[in-house]
Amino acid sequence: MIYLAEGCFWGVEEYFSQVDGVLDAVSGYANGRGDTTNYQLIHQTGHAETVEVTYDANRISLKELLLHFFRIIDPTSLNKQGNDRGSQYRTGIYYTDKADLAIIDEVFKEKAKDYKKKIVVEKAPLKHFIKAEEYHQDYLKKNPNGYCHIDINQATYPVIDESKYPKPSATEIKAKLSADEYRVTQKNETEKAFSNRYWDSFDAGIYVDVVTGEPLFSSKDKFESGCGWPSFSRPISPDVVRYKEDKSFNMTRTEVRSRSGNSHLGHVFTDGPKDQGGLRYCINSLSITFIPKADMEAKGYGYLLSSVE
Protein backbone atom coordinates (compact mmCIF):
# COMPACT_ATOMS: atom_id res chain seq x y z
CA MET A 1 0.00 0.00 0.00
CA ILE A 2 0.91 3.64 -0.42
CA TYR A 3 -0.94 6.67 0.94
CA LEU A 4 -1.31 9.69 -1.35
CA ALA A 5 -2.54 13.17 -0.44
CA GLU A 6 -3.38 15.27 -3.49
CA GLY A 7 -6.06 17.75 -2.48
CA CYS A 8 -9.74 16.79 -2.46
CA PHE A 9 -9.86 13.02 -2.19
CA TRP A 10 -13.02 12.54 -4.26
CA GLY A 11 -11.26 12.87 -7.60
CA VAL A 12 -8.03 11.25 -6.43
CA GLU A 13 -9.85 8.12 -5.28
CA GLU A 14 -11.73 7.86 -8.58
CA TYR A 15 -8.56 8.48 -10.60
CA PHE A 16 -6.58 5.70 -8.95
CA SER A 17 -9.52 3.30 -9.04
CA GLN A 18 -9.22 3.49 -12.84
CA VAL A 19 -5.46 2.86 -12.97
CA ASP A 20 -4.60 -0.63 -14.19
CA GLY A 21 -2.99 -2.60 -11.37
CA VAL A 22 -4.72 -0.74 -8.54
CA LEU A 23 -6.84 -3.13 -6.49
CA ASP A 24 -8.54 -0.63 -4.20
CA ALA A 25 -8.61 3.09 -3.42
CA VAL A 26 -10.08 4.33 -0.13
CA SER A 27 -10.60 7.92 1.00
CA GLY A 28 -9.45 8.94 4.45
CA TYR A 29 -7.42 11.26 6.64
CA ALA A 30 -3.72 10.86 7.43
CA ASN A 31 -0.84 12.25 9.48
CA GLY A 32 -2.53 14.77 11.69
CA ARG A 33 -2.59 15.29 15.43
CA GLY A 34 -4.10 12.18 16.97
CA ASP A 35 -5.70 9.09 15.53
CA THR A 36 -9.28 10.35 15.42
CA THR A 37 -10.87 13.03 13.26
CA ASN A 38 -13.70 13.57 10.80
CA TYR A 39 -14.50 15.71 7.77
CA GLN A 40 -15.67 18.63 9.92
CA LEU A 41 -12.59 18.59 12.15
CA ILE A 42 -9.65 17.95 9.83
CA HIS A 43 -8.86 21.65 9.46
CA GLN A 44 -8.33 21.67 13.24
CA THR A 45 -6.61 18.30 13.69
CA GLY A 46 -4.08 18.83 10.89
CA HIS A 47 -4.90 15.71 8.90
CA ALA A 48 -4.57 15.61 5.12
CA GLU A 49 -7.25 14.25 2.82
CA THR A 50 -5.51 11.08 1.67
CA VAL A 51 -6.23 8.04 -0.48
CA GLU A 52 -5.06 4.59 0.57
CA VAL A 53 -3.95 2.85 -2.64
CA THR A 54 -3.69 -0.93 -2.63
CA TYR A 55 -1.94 -2.26 -5.72
CA ASP A 56 -0.62 -5.39 -7.38
CA ALA A 57 3.15 -4.94 -7.66
CA ASN A 58 3.22 -7.51 -10.47
CA ARG A 59 1.05 -5.22 -12.61
CA ILE A 60 2.15 -1.75 -11.58
CA SER A 61 5.23 -0.55 -9.72
CA LEU A 62 5.40 2.01 -6.95
CA LYS A 63 7.34 4.30 -9.26
CA GLU A 64 4.57 4.16 -11.84
CA LEU A 65 2.01 5.01 -9.16
CA LEU A 66 4.09 7.99 -8.09
CA LEU A 67 4.35 9.19 -11.69
CA HIS A 68 0.55 9.08 -11.78
CA PHE A 69 0.59 11.05 -8.51
CA PHE A 70 2.73 13.83 -9.96
CA ARG A 71 0.69 13.86 -13.17
CA ILE A 72 -2.41 15.21 -11.40
CA ILE A 73 -0.98 17.69 -8.89
CA ASP A 74 0.89 20.96 -8.79
CA PRO A 75 3.77 19.85 -6.54
CA THR A 76 4.93 23.45 -6.02
CA SER A 77 1.61 24.59 -4.51
CA LEU A 78 1.51 24.61 -0.71
CA ASN A 79 -1.82 23.73 0.92
CA LYS A 80 -3.70 24.32 -2.32
CA GLN A 81 -4.86 22.09 -5.15
CA GLY A 82 -7.54 23.16 -7.61
CA ASN A 83 -10.01 25.47 -5.87
CA ASP A 84 -9.32 24.02 -2.43
CA ARG A 85 -7.18 25.75 0.18
CA GLY A 86 -6.07 24.69 3.62
CA SER A 87 -3.59 22.31 5.24
CA GLN A 88 -6.05 19.44 4.75
CA TYR A 89 -5.49 19.83 1.00
CA ARG A 90 -1.70 19.61 1.15
CA THR A 91 0.13 17.10 -1.00
CA GLY A 92 1.97 14.20 0.56
CA ILE A 93 3.29 10.68 0.11
CA TYR A 94 3.05 8.56 3.25
CA TYR A 95 4.67 5.12 3.32
CA THR A 96 4.58 2.09 5.61
CA ASP A 97 7.61 0.28 4.19
CA LYS A 98 11.00 1.99 4.65
CA ALA A 99 12.18 0.38 1.42
CA ASP A 100 9.72 2.59 -0.45
CA LEU A 101 11.61 5.73 0.54
CA ALA A 102 14.42 5.12 -1.96
CA ILE A 103 11.89 4.95 -4.80
CA ILE A 104 10.09 8.04 -3.52
CA ASP A 105 13.39 9.95 -3.34
CA GLU A 106 14.25 8.85 -6.88
CA VAL A 107 10.98 10.21 -8.26
CA PHE A 108 11.35 13.48 -6.31
CA LYS A 109 14.82 13.97 -7.78
CA GLU A 110 13.59 13.34 -11.32
CA LYS A 111 10.55 15.58 -10.96
CA ALA A 112 12.50 18.46 -9.42
CA LYS A 113 14.06 19.02 -12.86
CA ASP A 114 10.63 19.82 -14.31
CA TYR A 115 9.90 22.80 -12.05
CA LYS A 116 11.55 26.14 -11.40
CA LYS A 117 9.91 26.35 -7.98
CA LYS A 118 10.66 24.05 -5.07
CA ILE A 119 8.59 20.89 -4.71
CA VAL A 120 6.61 21.12 -1.46
CA VAL A 121 5.12 17.61 -1.37
CA GLU A 122 5.46 15.98 2.05
CA LYS A 123 7.17 12.60 2.25
CA ALA A 124 6.92 10.85 5.59
CA PRO A 125 6.14 7.56 7.28
CA LEU A 126 2.42 6.99 7.78
CA LYS A 127 1.47 7.84 11.37
CA HIS A 128 -2.15 6.84 11.06
CA PHE A 129 -4.92 6.56 8.47
CA ILE A 130 -8.54 7.12 9.39
CA LYS A 131 -11.09 5.94 6.86
CA ALA A 132 -13.41 8.76 5.79
CA GLU A 133 -17.15 8.67 6.28
CA GLU A 134 -19.05 6.29 4.00
CA TYR A 135 -20.61 9.08 1.92
CA HIS A 136 -17.09 10.08 0.80
CA GLN A 137 -16.26 6.59 -0.49
CA ASP A 138 -16.78 6.25 -4.26
CA TYR A 139 -18.18 9.77 -4.13
CA LEU A 140 -17.93 10.47 -7.86
CA LYS A 141 -19.50 7.13 -8.73
CA LYS A 142 -22.46 8.08 -6.55
CA ASN A 143 -22.39 11.70 -7.78
CA PRO A 144 -21.11 11.72 -11.40
CA ASN A 145 -21.44 15.50 -11.65
CA GLY A 146 -19.76 16.14 -8.32
CA TYR A 147 -16.80 18.47 -7.81
CA CYS A 148 -13.47 17.21 -9.09
CA HIS A 149 -10.27 19.25 -9.43
CA ILE A 150 -8.38 16.82 -11.68
CA ASP A 151 -8.81 15.29 -15.14
CA ILE A 152 -9.78 11.72 -14.33
CA ASN A 153 -9.58 10.74 -18.00
CA GLN A 154 -5.79 10.91 -17.72
CA ALA A 155 -5.86 7.73 -15.62
CA THR A 156 -6.27 5.72 -18.82
CA TYR A 157 -3.11 7.14 -20.42
CA PRO A 158 0.04 5.05 -19.92
CA VAL A 159 2.73 6.31 -17.59
CA ILE A 160 6.04 6.55 -19.45
CA ASP A 161 9.19 6.68 -17.34
CA GLU A 162 11.37 9.48 -18.71
CA SER A 163 14.50 8.05 -17.08
CA LYS A 164 14.38 5.09 -19.49
CA TYR A 165 14.94 7.44 -22.43
CA PRO A 166 17.82 9.78 -21.51
CA LYS A 167 18.91 12.52 -23.86
CA PRO A 168 22.31 11.86 -25.47
CA SER A 169 25.05 14.49 -25.42
CA ALA A 170 25.15 17.10 -28.18
CA THR A 171 28.07 15.25 -29.78
CA GLU A 172 26.21 11.94 -29.66
CA ILE A 173 23.09 13.50 -31.16
CA LYS A 174 25.03 14.95 -34.07
CA ALA A 175 26.69 11.59 -34.73
CA LYS A 176 23.45 9.65 -34.47
CA LEU A 177 21.17 11.76 -36.67
CA SER A 178 21.21 12.28 -40.40
CA ALA A 179 21.77 15.85 -41.59
CA ASP A 180 18.05 16.27 -42.27
CA GLU A 181 17.00 14.79 -38.92
CA TYR A 182 19.42 17.11 -37.16
CA ARG A 183 18.17 20.13 -39.07
CA VAL A 184 14.55 19.44 -38.10
CA THR A 185 14.91 18.24 -34.50
CA GLN A 186 17.72 20.55 -33.37
CA LYS A 187 17.28 23.61 -35.61
CA ASN A 188 13.46 23.67 -35.61
CA GLU A 189 13.13 23.39 -39.37
CA THR A 190 10.29 21.71 -41.27
CA GLU A 191 10.49 18.91 -43.83
CA LYS A 192 8.60 19.03 -47.12
CA ALA A 193 4.95 18.02 -47.17
CA PHE A 194 3.82 14.91 -49.06
CA SER A 195 7.39 13.68 -49.56
CA ASN A 196 8.22 12.39 -46.08
CA ARG A 197 8.22 8.80 -44.89
CA TYR A 198 5.17 8.66 -42.61
CA TRP A 199 2.58 11.11 -43.95
CA ASP A 200 0.52 8.36 -45.63
CA SER A 201 1.51 5.37 -43.46
CA PHE A 202 -1.12 3.85 -41.18
CA ASP A 203 0.41 0.56 -40.04
CA ALA A 204 -0.18 -0.46 -36.40
CA GLY A 205 2.56 0.57 -33.99
CA ILE A 206 4.02 3.52 -32.12
CA TYR A 207 6.14 6.51 -33.06
CA VAL A 208 9.10 7.36 -30.84
CA ASP A 209 11.50 10.30 -30.57
CA VAL A 210 14.27 9.78 -33.13
CA VAL A 211 16.76 11.16 -30.59
CA THR A 212 15.87 9.29 -27.38
CA GLY A 213 13.42 6.54 -28.32
CA GLU A 214 10.81 7.94 -25.93
CA PRO A 215 7.30 6.93 -27.08
CA LEU A 216 5.34 9.88 -28.45
CA PHE A 217 2.37 8.82 -30.59
CA SER A 218 0.27 5.76 -31.39
CA SER A 219 -1.02 4.65 -34.77
CA LYS A 220 -4.43 4.38 -33.09
CA ASP A 221 -4.57 8.19 -32.95
CA LYS A 222 -3.19 8.82 -36.47
CA PHE A 223 -5.53 10.19 -39.14
CA GLU A 224 -5.45 11.50 -42.70
CA SER A 225 -5.57 15.29 -42.50
CA GLY A 226 -4.60 16.21 -46.05
CA CYS A 227 -1.75 18.44 -44.84
CA GLY A 228 1.06 16.19 -46.09
CA TRP A 229 2.61 15.46 -42.69
CA PRO A 230 1.81 12.76 -40.12
CA SER A 231 -1.21 13.89 -38.10
CA PHE A 232 -2.32 12.64 -34.70
CA SER A 233 -5.30 13.55 -32.52
CA ARG A 234 -3.26 13.28 -29.30
CA PRO A 235 0.09 12.10 -27.92
CA ILE A 236 0.33 8.57 -26.54
CA SER A 237 0.50 10.17 -23.07
CA PRO A 238 0.11 13.83 -22.05
CA ASP A 239 3.39 13.57 -20.14
CA VAL A 240 5.70 13.06 -23.13
CA VAL A 241 5.33 16.36 -24.98
CA ARG A 242 6.02 19.98 -24.15
CA TYR A 243 4.51 23.10 -25.70
CA LYS A 244 6.07 26.41 -26.63
CA GLU A 245 4.73 29.56 -28.26
CA ASP A 246 6.18 29.99 -31.75
CA LYS A 247 6.00 33.41 -33.40
CA SER A 248 8.19 32.64 -36.40
CA PHE A 249 7.15 33.58 -39.96
CA ASN A 250 4.83 36.31 -38.64
CA MET A 251 2.47 33.71 -37.18
CA THR A 252 1.55 32.65 -33.67
CA ARG A 253 1.55 28.87 -33.35
CA THR A 254 2.01 26.27 -30.64
CA GLU A 255 5.19 24.29 -31.11
CA VAL A 256 5.34 20.68 -29.88
CA ARG A 257 8.62 19.33 -28.47
CA SER A 258 9.53 15.98 -26.97
CA ARG A 259 9.92 15.79 -23.21
CA SER A 260 13.19 13.95 -22.70
CA GLY A 261 15.03 14.87 -25.90
CA ASN A 262 13.61 18.39 -26.27
CA SER A 263 13.39 17.62 -29.99
CA HIS A 264 11.36 19.87 -32.26
CA LEU A 265 8.45 17.69 -33.41
CA GLY A 266 6.05 20.07 -35.15
CA HIS A 267 2.98 22.06 -34.13
CA VAL A 268 -0.50 21.44 -32.75
CA PHE A 269 -3.60 23.01 -34.28
CA THR A 270 -7.28 23.12 -33.35
CA ASP A 271 -8.66 21.86 -36.67
CA GLY A 272 -8.52 18.14 -35.87
CA PRO A 273 -11.41 15.66 -35.77
CA LYS A 274 -14.08 16.95 -33.39
CA ASP A 275 -15.01 13.44 -32.28
CA GLN A 276 -11.40 12.87 -31.21
CA GLY A 277 -10.94 16.09 -29.25
CA GLY A 278 -10.48 18.61 -32.06
CA LEU A 279 -6.67 18.72 -32.09
CA ARG A 280 -4.24 18.01 -34.92
CA TYR A 281 -0.64 17.28 -33.99
CA CYS A 282 1.22 18.00 -37.23
CA ILE A 283 4.53 16.17 -36.83
CA ASN A 284 7.69 15.95 -38.91
CA SER A 285 8.49 12.39 -40.02
CA LEU A 286 12.18 13.20 -39.52
CA SER A 287 11.54 13.74 -35.79
CA ILE A 288 10.10 10.29 -35.17
CA THR A 289 10.84 6.61 -35.71
CA PHE A 290 8.09 4.05 -36.29
CA ILE A 291 8.10 0.84 -34.24
CA PRO A 292 5.75 -1.75 -35.80
CA LYS A 293 3.38 -3.47 -33.40
CA ALA A 294 5.03 -6.82 -34.15
CA ASP A 295 8.40 -5.47 -32.94
CA MET A 296 7.26 -3.60 -29.84
CA GLU A 297 7.82 -6.41 -27.35
CA ALA A 298 11.31 -7.19 -28.61
CA LYS A 299 12.32 -3.52 -28.60
CA GLY A 300 11.14 -2.89 -25.03
CA TYR A 301 7.81 -1.26 -25.80
CA GLY A 302 5.57 -4.21 -24.98
CA TYR A 303 4.07 -2.31 -22.06
CA LEU A 304 2.40 0.00 -24.60
CA LEU A 305 0.68 -2.65 -26.70
CA SER A 306 -2.68 -1.78 -25.15
CA SER A 307 -2.23 1.77 -26.47
CA VAL A 308 -2.08 0.43 -30.02
CA GLU A 309 -4.76 -2.26 -29.89
UniProtKB/Swiss-Prot annotation:
Record's GO cellular component terms:
cytoplasm
Catalysis: reaction(s): L-methionyl-[protein] + [thioredoxin]-disulfide + H2O = L-methionyl-(S)-S-oxide-[protein] + [thioredoxin]-dithiol; [thioredoxin]-disulfide + L-methionine + H2O = L-methionine (S)-S-oxide + [thioredoxin]-dithiol; L-methionyl-[protein] + [thioredoxin]-disulfide + H2O = L-methionyl-(R)-S-oxide-[protein] + [thioredoxin]-dithiol
GO terms, biological process = protein modification process; protein repair; response to oxidative stress
The molecular function GO annotations come to: L-methionine:thioredoxin-disulfide S-oxidoreductase activity; peptide-methionine (R)-S-oxide reductase activity; peptide-methionine (S)-S-oxide reductase activity
Q: In its keyword annotation, does this UniProt entry include NAD? A: no
The answer to whether the entry has keyword Oxidoreductase is yes
Q: Which InterPro entries match?
A: Met_Sox_Rdtase_MsrA_dom, Met_Sox_Rdtase_MsrA_sf, Met_Sox_Rdtase_MsrB, Met_Sox_Rdtase_MsrB_dom, Mss4-like_sf
The UniProt record lists the EC number as 1.8.4.11, 1.8.4.12
Disulphide linkage map: none
Q: What class of enzyme is it?
A: oxidoreductase
MsrB domain boundaries: 170-293
- A Pfam family that this protein carries is PMSR
Positions of the UniProt region annotated as Peptide methionine sulfoxide reductase A: 1-153
Instruction: Give the positions the UniProt entry annotates as the active site.
Output: 8, 282
Q: Which UniProt keywords apply?
A: Multifunctional enzyme, Oxidoreductase
Against NCBIfam families, the record matches this protein to: msrA, peptide-methionine (R)-S-oxide reductase MsrB
Family assignment?
In the N-terminal section; belongs to the MsrA Met sulfoxide reductase family. In the C-terminal section; belongs to the MsrB Met sulfoxide reductase family.
- Give the protein's biological function: Has an important function as a repair enzyme for proteins that have been inactivated by oxidation. Catalyzes the reversible oxidation-reduction of methionine sulfoxide in proteins to methionine.
Q: What is this protein called?
A: Peptide methionine sulfoxide reductase MsrA/MsrB
- Organism name: Streptococcus pyogenes serotype M3 (strain ATCC BAA-595 / MGAS315)
What lineage does the source organism belong to? Answer: Bacteria, Bacillati, Bacillota, Bacilli, Lactobacillales
Q: Which gene encodes it?
A: msrAB
